Amino acid sequence: MSKIFTRSFRVRWGELDPSGTVSPANYLRYLIETAWDWGTAMGWDANYSQNPDVFWVIRETEIHILHSLRHNDEFGLTIWMVNWKGVRGTRCFELKFKDSDEVIAQGTQQVVLESASGKQA
């Protein structure tokens, strides 16, 4: 697994809440899109994700927003794995303005389950 992966984004108007800033759900969408692209870059494409025996469950997500994102802001989301033990892995991420400082830092706990029994693989 590549240790670090970065993807670029530009904030679209549909990602904003009534206050004109990115809604919390869209920060999670950015994370999922980046994680998906990270997997695809490693060969874990849609065919791999359709494996009926294994699936990913996100147990916990913690996001610290340091600066609000607004329409047309451009930023990169960098993701990396910090720990993998048994069926649990922890990955971190940070968002940085294209030419500036950190926007968000996050840690996500994941677990791989066997779908037939629902037990940890």
Language model segments and positions:
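HotDog/MaoC-like acyl-thioester-processing domains
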Residues: 3-7, 64-74, 81-121
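Short secondary-structure boundary segments
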Residues: 54, 59, 67, 76-79
